[in-house]
Curated annotation (Swiss-Prot):
Membrane topology: Lipid-anchor
Sequence positions that bind Fe(2+): H68, H140, E206, D281
InterPro entries: AdhesinB, Bact_metal-bind_prot9, Lipoprotein_PsaA-like, ZnuA-like
Pfam families hit by this protein: ZnuA (PF01297)
Subcellular localization, as worded in the UniProt entry: Cell membrane
Protein name per Swiss-Prot or TrEMBL: Iron ABC transporter substrate-binding lipoprotein MtsA
Lipid-substituted positions (N-palmitoyl cysteine): C21
Record-stated family: Belongs to the bacterial solute-binding protein 9 family. Lipoprotein receptor antigen (Lrai) subfamily.
Functional note: Part of the ATP-binding cassette (ABC) transport system MtsABC involved in iron import. Binds iron with high affinity and specificity and delivers it to the membrane permease for translocation into the cytoplasm. Has low affinity for Zn(2+) and Cu(2+).
Gene3D superfamilies the record matches: Nitrogenase molybdenum iron protein domain
Gene that produces this protein: mtsA
Amino acid sequence: MGKKMSLILGAFLSVFLLVACSSTGTKTAKSDKLKVVATNSIIADMTKAIAGDKIDLHSIVPIGQDPHEYEPLPEDVEKTSNADVIFYNGINLEDGGQAWFTKLVKNAQKTKNKDYFAVSDGIDVIYLEGASEKGKEDPHAWLNLENGIIYSKNIAKQLIAKDPKNKETYEKNLKAYVAKLEKLDKEAKSKFDAIAENKKLIVTSEGCFKYFSKAYGVPSAYIWEINTEEEGTPDQISSLIEKLKVIKPSALFVESSVDRRPMETVSKDSGIPIYSEIFTDSIAKKGKPGDSYYAMMKWNLDKISEGLAK
């Protein structure tokens, strides 16, 4: 009986050690992947499109939330501290002064252009109205697909530098992704070229479509200029309504990541319908329309062109 029990215990210990070693091996393999942090869902999605399953990816600002102003969670602090590479937008979105990202990387003892990189590097910056100095940049450069391509190339460059063993995968995925974005950009320009000039006006809550306007030849109007300002004050709303009496667009649009009520007031008082919700600072939740950078841009381009052509 004692011998039999010893054999059973021996077998059990062998299985236990095998499972433990297997589990440890899995954890080691997982930890071997490049640890990447992106500040928001748009940058995270671009990174995922290029890297696939070659990295461990963490996105800081949750889907649907405003990346302009955010309070990092303990998990964000931990992931940032342990990251091999961090991607952020820059140009006045989440950085500068006492901005949340500036404090986050400082506390994590990370170094710019060594540990964290602005994916907007190299774009032609557009400034807020009446401004031209640092800290007054319009951050929404990704709303021009040509800039989205620049973002993607910057991401791929740093992934390759940090993880050269997966260079071939990153280059292959980048090439396919850029081709996809270029095709959509070309289609978008054709769509907006076909719309009458007197119908071209994008009206949104935040004045975030300057890059889009420049790329696709469609002027924009808004209630407030950037989400770090007061949003939807009576003066802002009445000022836009007065403009709309002169311009008379066929449709209004409201962003998925802002309070709808100011634009609903504009719609009610101006008599102009809200045609569609559109995406600016965040992609949609998985499985919903607009759940990737490509999908959100396609949605925006389709809905805006449809609304203006009415």
